[in-house]
Every structure is written in C-alpha cells, then in structure tokens.
C-alpha cells in the first residue's frame, strides 16, 4: 500500500507505462525512501513487457462492490467458445488483448459475487486464464505462458473444482513439453491422474500429454500405451464444460498426438503415414492447426527420406505461418529446416530455403 495520496508501486508502474511519467512527475509527493522501480537491479526483467503480460491478473484491490447477475456466467461461457473458434482462424496475436481484458473483468466480478455465482465465475475465470496462457504459448512467449498457467492453477484451486485443477496441471505440462522437459511433463500428468474421479475428458487430456512426455524421453512403448488407453476413454467424453474440448473439436485428435510423438521419436515413415491420414480429415476452418500439422508432416517426410515431398508440403504450411504469426508453427518449420540439412546443397534444399525465407524475415 502507498501512503495517503501516493499510489502503490504497481499503480505507479501502470501510470508510467500509460503516461510516460512517474507519480512525482505528476505532482504526487513521494514518500521517504521511494525508489523508482526502474532503479532496482532487475537487469534480467523487461519491466514494461512483464507489466503488460501480468497486469490483467494482478489488479490491486479492494474494488467497489457491485451486484453480479448469475447470467454473466453463461455469457462468459458463450464468449469463450467464440474465442476458441477465433483462435483456430486467427492465431494468438489478435486475441491476447481481448481475452486478457475479459479475464480482468471476471476477476473484478469475482470480488463482489457471492455463493454459487462466485464459484461459477471462478470456474469460467480459470478457463479464460488457461486460454490466455495458451495464446502466449502459441505466440512463443513461454515466460508469459508459464505465468498464466500458474494463474489458471490458482483460480482452479480457489474454485475447489477437481476437474479444473487436473486441467490446470495438464496446462502446465504443455509448457514443459515446449521446454523439452519430458520428465516434468510426466510428473505433472501423473499428478493429475492420481484422482480417479476426474471426468474422462481430463483423463484423456492428461494421458495424451503424458505421451508427449514419454516421447521426449524416448519411450515409444509408453507413448502407444497411453494413446491407446486414452482412445478407449474418448467415447465416454460427454460433459458440457466449455473448456478443454480439443479432443471433440479436432478430427483424429489422438492420432494427431501419436503422429507428433512418432515424429519426435524419429519414426519418420510411421509419422508420415499417420499425417497423411490425419490431414485428410482436418477442416479448412482449423487453419492454424492445419498449418502446424503440415509442418510436422513435412518433417516426417524428410525423416522418411522423401525431401521433394517434404518441400511440397512445406509450401502450404509456410503460407499459413505467415498469415497467422504462430510462433509454434515457425518452431515446427525450424525443425523441418534441420531435418532437411542432408539436402542443404541440393536443389531441393535451396527450394526449401527460398520457401522459408518469408517466415524467417517475419520472425
């Protein structure tokens, strides 16, 4: 808390980011011992970026009390479904600000709501935080993604909803997957699966993510076992929760995961065969996901010693990568570039370099 008439440090930082001036430059009388945040020794933190990432989740209180209509819960749930659809079409950059602002509003309402209305808002708030985390992850900012995955876990714990809490652990495991920490992924997914009362959807999510962890540590047997068990469960996914529905929205969801794991394990021919089947079922509306799958398919073709096919597939992936700005897609194309190194000096390698130039220029 700041002294009377002097804003708390978090507010001082927001004022500076908005107006370019510190409170004492705006006429406030600084308290004894005040040190501007920029003077602290934090060379490893880009404070403006940090504040912009965290601001929606760290609003200081108290806030003014207000009546909260229970109908707002369904309103935010309906908006969430629209955001999921937009994410598939647009990619992360056009949505982060909108979804973060809605999370901030939900957080404000939670502070005034009572009883079941408050519990319902906490549950939907956790889903919004999870989506913000995913958007940052897709944009390639794993630090911001980790922060928002942590907020998801906090809100899930506050909601006392075991299914949401399990979902939040899977969210954390997704970040560990992108960090290449296979054992971290396995630990988090096993922690989620300890609770055998979880809805089938959450168990499916945890098992497929654990399969990714297994692929990172080179365990194909575990990959197949986990995907097969999840496949036995997926027909029982029948809840009406607004979050975590990729397993229902994504055609061939589990085979997508298996193909990705096989590619990571270096099983080029097996992965290439699976991607050929999976991509036939992916709708044009799932443009961002299709781009990621195409990039992985191209890498699998390279692993199967089919460089010309890899380059042909890469053309379509690059077009989508440029449109969506997905860092995840650029990362997949970077993996393809490494897989094509044996043909670096061949005409097909030069063709790939030309195709990837538009992505590399925009990164």
PLM region spans:
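Recognition helix of helix-turn-helix/homeodomain-like DNA-binding domains
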Residues: 1-7
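DNA major-groove recognition helix of helix-turn-helix/homeodomain DNA-binding modules
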Residues: 7-25
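Short N-terminal amphipathic alpha-helices
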Residues: 8, 24-28, 117-121
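Compositionally biased, long intrinsically disordered regions
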Residues: 24-74
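Conserved binding/catalytic microenvironments
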Residues: 66-363
């Amino acid at each position: 808390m700041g002294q009377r008439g002097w804003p708390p440090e978090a507010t001082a930082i927001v004022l500076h980011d908005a107006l370019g001036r510190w409170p004492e430059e705006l006429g406030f009388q600084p308290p004894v011992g005040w040190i501007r945040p920029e003077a602290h020794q934090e060379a490893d933190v880009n404070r403006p970026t940090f504040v912009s990432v965290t601001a929606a989740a760290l609003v200081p209180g108290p806030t003014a009390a207000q009546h909260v209509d229970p109908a707002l819960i369904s309103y935010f749930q309906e908006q969430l479904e629209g955001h999921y659809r937009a994410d598939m079409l647009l990619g992360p950059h056009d949505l982060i600000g909108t979804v973060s602002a809605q999370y901030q509003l939900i957080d404000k309402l939670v502070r005034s709501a009572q009883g079941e209305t408050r519990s319902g808002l906490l549950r939907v708030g956790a889903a919004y935080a999870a989506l913000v985390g995913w958007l940052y992850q897709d944009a390639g900012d794993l630090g911001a993604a980790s922060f928002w995955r942590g907020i998801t876990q906090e809100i899930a714990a506050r909601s006392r909803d075991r299914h949401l809490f399990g979902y939040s652990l899977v969210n954390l495991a997704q970040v560990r997957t992108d960090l290449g920490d296979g054992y971290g992924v396995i630990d988090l997914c096993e922690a989620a699966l300890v609770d055998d009362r979880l809805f089938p959807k959450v168990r499916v999510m945890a098992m497929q993510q654990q399969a990714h962890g297994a692929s990172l540590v080179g365990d194909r047997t575990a990959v197949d076992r986990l995907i097969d068990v999840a496949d036995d469960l997926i027909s029982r996914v029948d809840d009406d929760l607004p979050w975590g529905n990729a397993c229902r929205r994504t055609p061939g969801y589990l085979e997508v995961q298996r193909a990705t794991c096989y590619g990571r394990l270096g099983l080029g021919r097996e992965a290439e065969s699976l991607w050929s089947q999976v991509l036939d079922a992916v709708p044009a509306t799932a443009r961002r996901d299709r781009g990621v799958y195409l990039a992985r398919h191209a890498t699998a073709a390279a692993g199967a010693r089919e460089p010309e096919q890899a380059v042909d597939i890469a053309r379509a992936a690059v077009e989508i990568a440029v449109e969506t700005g997905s860092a995840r897609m650029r990362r997949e194309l970077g993996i393809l570039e490494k897989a094509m190194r044996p043909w670096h000096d061949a005409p097909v390698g030069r063709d790939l370099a030309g195709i990837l130039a538009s992505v590399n220029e925009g990164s």
